[in-house]
Amino acid sequence: MRGVVWNGKIDVTEDLEARAPGTNEVRVRIAAAGVCHSDVSVIDGTIPFPTPLVMGHEGAGVVEEVGSSVTKVKPGDHVVLVTLGHCGQCDACESGFPTHCRDTFGKTSQPFTYKGEPAFMFANTSVFAEHTVVKESQAVVIDPAVPLAAASLIGCGVLTGAGAVWNRAKVGRGDTVAVFGVGGIGLNAVQAAWIAGAVRIVAVDANAAKESLARDFGATDFVDARATDAVAAIKEILPDGVDHSFECVGHPAVLRQAIDILGWGGNCVIIGVPPPATEASFRVAALTHIDRGILGSRYGSARPHVDVPIVIDLYRQGRFKLDELVTRTYPLDEVETVFSDMAEGKVARGVLIP
């Protein structure tokens, strides 16, 4: 089968195979795969991973084959794939916090062969390929009427951005919000805040060309971080600061801005992923004196089998934008073009069609 392998360089290859599913696994024919900044982070070393590696982690497709113990999905089902390979049995899973499941972090598997040798899976999904094999818990069945190119974005960009707003920050009606970085993750944070009833949503980005799209997704204001001091600009709009800020860039300087713009009792949610050894600094008094807080957000604190259906329902009601996130689709051969377009800010999301 065809797929994209990282082995010190990008290789769009036909010399790739995915094994049959195990007892609690499903084999999926990938119909569409979103390209996320985390995919770039594998290449530049921000996210260290063993190689050879079958790339991609944001996808949707059709179930082809299921293992003997699988009961929740069947061949022919349209599914969104999620990166959480949670066990479903530990205290975290049973308490409704699958992102806290220890089985979901730091483990590697090799369900592929590349040129006859074992190849690693990325983020438990590896969707830059014609087929993949995942746990049953990672395949969330959706309405087949939903376009799979749009649905493919739910498994990472949507759950991570919207989940941080709904599940971690718990933005409510009348709240004020600032979103730093309005790429694929940030746009979903913006529209989730709008859906939650935020009265003022300030989008901040160094690319002024993103203003129109940010406003389309619900931003009430836009700050060009390259042209002005973002903190000062936001305080002109909201002198008392914001209730919630979301750092979607993964840069210590931006994190400091996201903290400094908080109002009394405000919380900053960190979504962006910097290199593992990155450290950040802030004034302790800036938190303790006015009851501010900092929250990490892993995968939007998502409960995939709850949150994916919610997103699909909102999409079908015309309240959640998915189609508008897909700027362009690309064949696998153009994977490097997608990366280039993303780096230049030309796409909200590029989607590969294996």
Predicted regions and their residues:
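Glycine-rich phosphate-binding loop and adjacent beta-alpha segment
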Residues: 251-319, 354
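Conserved beta-strand positions in the Rossmann-like core of class I SAM-dependent methyltransferases
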Residues: 64, 201-202, 269
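A short acidic, Gly/Pro-enriched loop at the edge of an enzyme's catalytic core
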Residues: 233-243
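Mid-domain Rossmann-like dinucleotide-binding core that forms the NAD(H)/NADP(H) cofactor-binding site
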Residues: 130, 137-138, 143-228, 232
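Cysteine-cluster motifs in flexible loop/terminal segments that predominantly coordinate metals
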Residues: 82-137
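C-terminal hydrophobic helical "lid"/dimerization subdomain
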Residues: 1, 240, 256-260, 305-354
